[in-house]
């Protein structure tokens, strides 16, 4: 019944999306202003974990805020604050929880010290791809679990974007075996960082705004961030030359929209539906943007900045997969919420993998002539 109610609201709001966003331009803005003048105007603050105007992630938050305003006819306006403007990047969750901001935009693995199970809702090493993750969230019980673990913090989560499969990271030396990870200080948050710890590396959790300086000054020896589109914008090629793939640690990283529970529930039903549709549209649009932008950015990195593109050895990936499986089992055993989420995640992963082995993987191999 809950799903039917949500779907009916989404359908109504989707019609508003088409009529309002399709207009665009100054005429659309005038309509928004007129509607706002005739209705109560609600003003929200959105805190983010991203640098100001950062491509894909930061701009994704800004676009989401603009669409909420347009779709609501100016009744709900959201002002976006980049990391550090209102609160530090890694304090965005707390700001939304206590009501300092009504909305947040970040990644759930940043709050692992507060909510260990939250890490599963950004990404899991060797886990679900972006599309598989969305399917688990909307049709496999993932969203309900996500909402449940945030209840004690008065926060409502929603998936608000995904850059897709990431790169394996930037290094100043070749990585040929597990021995090369020994003592390596690498920026890698979430479960991937715990896997690194198991193989002898030193994981460091840094927000995006601090990565370049840390890598350039030697505070860290290596880093992963997102992929070519974002990594080029950050200038990471100036601090390291070896660029490894695949991104075993982040096969699809969900970006998270956070809502203060009291603020969200105070909205009328139609505004709640508008917000949900806007977030769901942002979730898909980010993947579209990154998929369209990554390859040209990668060519720029390799051809213009002499970045050395390297593939992790197969035996190294197998060892990391083994360490990842052990890490996930240990995490689940230590925390009841993590156990519940992991069980659901693993069940869905096993099921969808069976299908993708004969569909996605088989097709990609055929397309490549293999």
Predicted regions and their residues:
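N-terminal secretory/targeting leader peptides
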Residues: 24-133, 148-370
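C-terminal motif of bacterial Sec signal peptides marking the signal peptidase cleavage site
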Residues: 18-22
């Amino acid at each position: 019944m809950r799903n039917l109610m949500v779907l009916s609201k989404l359908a109504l709001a989707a019609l508003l999306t088409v009529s309002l966003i399709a207009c665009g331009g100054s005429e659309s803005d005038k309509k928004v202003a007129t509607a706002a003048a005739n209705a109560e105007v609600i003003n929200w603050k959105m805190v983010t974990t991203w640098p100001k105007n950062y491509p894909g992630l930061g701009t994704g938050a800004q676009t989401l805020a603009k669409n909420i305003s347009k779709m609501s006819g100016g009744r709900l306006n959201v002002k976006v604050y980049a990391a550090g403007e209102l609160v530090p990047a890694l304090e965005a969750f707390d700001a939304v929880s206590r009501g300092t901001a009504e909305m947040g935009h970040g990644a759930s693995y940043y709050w692992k010290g507060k909510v260990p199970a939250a890490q599963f809702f950004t990404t899991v090493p060797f886990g679900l791809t972006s599309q598989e993750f969305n399917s688990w969230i909307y049709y496999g019980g993932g969203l309900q679990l996500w909402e449940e673990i945030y209840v004690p913090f008065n926060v409502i989560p929603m998936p608000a974007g995904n850059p897709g499969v990431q790169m394996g990271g930037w290094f100043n030396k070749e990585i040929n075996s597990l021995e090369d990870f020994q003592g390596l200080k690498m920026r890698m948050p979430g479960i991937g960082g715990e896997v690194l710890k198991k193989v002898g590396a030193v994981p460091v959790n840094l927000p995006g705004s601090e990565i370049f300086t840390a890598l350039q000054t030697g505070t860290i020896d290596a880093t992963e961030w997102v992929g070519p589109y974002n990594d080029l914008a950050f200038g990471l090629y100036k601090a390291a030359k070896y660029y490894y793939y695949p991104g075993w640690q982040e096969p699809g990283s969900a970006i998270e929209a956070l809502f203060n529970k009291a603020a969200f529930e105070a909205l009328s039903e139609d505004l709640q539906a508008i917000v949900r549709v806007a977030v769901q549209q942002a979730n898909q649009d980010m993947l579209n943007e990154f998929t369209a932008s990554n390859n040209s950015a990668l060519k720029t990195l390799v051809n213009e900045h002499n970045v050395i593109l390297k593939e992790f050895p197969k035996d190294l990936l197998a060892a990391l997969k083994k360490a990842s499986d052990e890490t996930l089992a240990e995490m689940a055993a230590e925390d009841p919420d993590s156990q519940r989420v992991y069980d659901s995640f693993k069940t869905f992963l096993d099921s969808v993998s069976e299908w993708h082995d004969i569909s996605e993987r088989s097709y990609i191999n055929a397309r490549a002539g293999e």
